[in-house]
């Protein structure tokens, strides 16, 4: 959520900044309501001052044994008027808050201006795509032929875009999760948390999924609960409505979770295989930092996610998202895209974002430099470290062999106890 003072004092700057996102924002209603609210607050303060003056006069008259009936009636009338005005102010503040919740974050000045993903800017590449001496297969073909992925039964049991992992496929998924968590906790300094997979609406509001993206979420019928679309939601809200000790910042957390996304409008090739599932596993990285360090922390976060792919030996590239492709809550985002031979292209496997104080304002996460200091909003960051299903897909495709087997990346062998996946 944007700072209401920034919107009030510099509406033209906010509108122009959000135009770069492709958002045609009209702040007329917001500014009208804000002006009405401020006038009402002045009126309230004047009436409270008058009520206090009348109250003092009533006290003076009573001490002298003089009647004060008329003044008592006047004070009651003033109290009724103040209550009515307070109710009006509360209603207007509710409307202002609702409008603020729909306004996306302002892009950082370093974000390239562009209309959509075609104008994202490549930053760097790592590794060379493998040159096969045979025609490589897609991961869904490999998984079915090795009998380690069962899409048909997943569809039968639940519906489209649900999958059973079987045998060494299930073991590979688990190995990837454990490898990522071990790397981030032992080498990158993250503290692991294991969060709830169900959160309330306040948590979804805090990270920016609600109200804008309600149709992409799975809501539990009859309850104010949602299945999490990412561990970002519960882990960020871990400190909702708290004031943190500035000496304890930065705070780094990593978390494994299942993720659930309705994505009603999703279509095309990505809905085949493991690329775009309704349920998938992910290891998430979340940071709470001081504002002056947040962009340095974004670079570190991105490098931490990249390290997973480097150790797995998977070619990838990093792109910075342009303004038109930027997520609702993000001020700046790097996407890490892994090479998938079946696409003959790079596919997103991680998004690493700095939200600045956008989520912290919504979730009321602040910190104090010292006990007597004024609380300030933290900056929050998060990134996938990584999406597990897409990592498995990349391993199957990049490490496939002509005989139909798949070589297990060296760093995963201690977790699996095998160096190759064969059909049994």
UniProtKB/Swiss-Prot annotation:
L-serine binds at residues 230-232, 284, 384. Pathway: Aminoacyl-tRNA biosynthesis; selenocysteinyl-tRNA(Sec) biosynthesis; L-seryl-tRNA(Sec) from L-serine and tRNA(Sec): step 1/1. Its EC number is 6.1.1.11. It comes from the Bacteria. InterPro entries: aa-tRNA-synt_IIb, aa-tRNA-synth_II, aa-tRNA-synth_II/BPL/LPL, Ser-tRNA-ligase_type_1, Ser-tRNA-synth_1_N, SerRS_1_N_sf, SerRS_core, tRNA-bd_arm. GO terms for biological process: selenocysteine biosynthetic process; seryl-tRNA aminoacylation. ATP binds at residues 261-263, 348-351. It is an enzyme of class 6 (ligase). It catalyses: tRNA(Ser) + L-serine + ATP = L-seryl-tRNA(Ser) + AMP + diphosphate + H(+); tRNA(Sec) + L-serine + ATP = L-seryl-tRNA(Sec) + AMP + diphosphate + H(+). One of its GO terms (molecular function) is ATP binding. CDD domains: SerRS_core. Keywords: Aminoacyl-tRNA synthetase, ATP-binding, Cytoplasm, Ligase, Nucleotide-binding, Protein biosynthesis. It is found in: Cytoplasm. Catalyzes the attachment of serine to tRNA(Ser). Is also able to aminoacylate tRNA(Sec) with serine, to form the misacylated tRNA L-seryl-tRNA(Sec), which will be further converted into selenocysteinyl-tRNA(Sec). HAMAP family: Ser_tRNA_synth_type1. PANTHER family: SERINE--TRNA LIGASE (PTHR43697:SF1), SERYL-TRNA SYNTHETASE (PTHR43697). Belongs to the class-II aminoacyl-tRNA synthetase family. Type-1 seryl-tRNA synthetase subfamily. Consists of two distinct domains, a catalytic core and a N-terminal extension that is involved in tRNA binding. Homodimer. The tRNA molecule binds across the dimer. This is Serine--tRNA ligase. It comes from Carboxydothermus hydrogenoformans (strain ATCC BAA-161 / DSM 6008 / Z-2901). The lineage of its organism: Bacteria, Bacillati, Bacillota, Clostridia, Thermoanaerobacterales.
């Amino acid at each position: 959520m944007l700072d209401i003072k920034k919107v009030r004092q510099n509406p033209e700057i906010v509108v122009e900044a959000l135009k770069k996102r492709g958002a045609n924002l009209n702040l007329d209603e917001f500014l009208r309501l804000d002006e009405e609210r401020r006038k009402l607050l002045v009126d309230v303060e004047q009436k409270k001052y008058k009520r206090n003056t009348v109250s003092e006069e009533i006290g003076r008259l009573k001490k002298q044994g003089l009647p004060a009936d008329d003044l008592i009636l006047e004070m009651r009338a003033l109290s009724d008027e103040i209550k009515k005005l307070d109710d009006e102010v509360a209603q207007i503040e509710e409307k202002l808050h609702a409008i603020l919740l729909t306004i996306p974050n302002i892009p950082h000045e370093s974000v390239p201006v562009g209309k959509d993903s075609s104008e994202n800017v490549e930053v760097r590449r790592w590794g060379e795509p493998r040159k096969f001496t045979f025609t490589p297969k897609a991961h869904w073909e490999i998984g079915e032929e090795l009998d380690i992925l069962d899409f048909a039964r997943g569809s039968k049991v639940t519906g489209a875009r649900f999958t059973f992992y079987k045998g060494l496929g299930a073991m590979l998924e688990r190995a990837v999760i454990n490898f990522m968590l071990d790397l981030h906790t032992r080498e990158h300094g993250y503290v692991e948390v294991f969060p709830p997979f169900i959160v309330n609406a306040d948590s979804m509001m805090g990270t920016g999924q609600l109200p804008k993206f309600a149709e992409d979420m799975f809501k539990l019928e009859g309850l104010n609960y949602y299945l999490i679309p990412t561990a970002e939601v519960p882990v960020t809200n871990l400190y909702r409505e708290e004031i943190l000790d500035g000496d304890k910042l930065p705070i780094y957390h990593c978390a494994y979770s299942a993720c659930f996304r309705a994505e009603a409008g999703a279509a095309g090739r990505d809905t085949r295989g493991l690329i775009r599932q309704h349920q998938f596993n992910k290891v998430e990285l979340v940071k709470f930092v001081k504002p002056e360090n947040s962009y340095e922390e974004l670079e570190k976060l991105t490098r931490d996610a990249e390290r997973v792919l480097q150790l797995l030996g998977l070619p990838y590239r990093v792109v910075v998202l342009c303004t038109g492709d930027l997520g609702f809550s993000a001020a700046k985002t790097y996407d890490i895209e892994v090479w998938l031979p079946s696409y003959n292209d790079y596919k997103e496997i991680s998004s690493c974002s700095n939200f600045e104080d956008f989520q912290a304002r919504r979730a009321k996460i602040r910190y104090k430099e010292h006990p007597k200091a004024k609380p300030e909003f933290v900056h929050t960051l998060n990134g996938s470290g990584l999406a597990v299903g897409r990592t498995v897909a990349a391993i199957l495709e990049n490490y496939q062999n002509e005989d139909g087997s798949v070589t297990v990346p060296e760093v995963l062998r201690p977790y699996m106890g095998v160096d190759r996946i064969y059909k049994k």
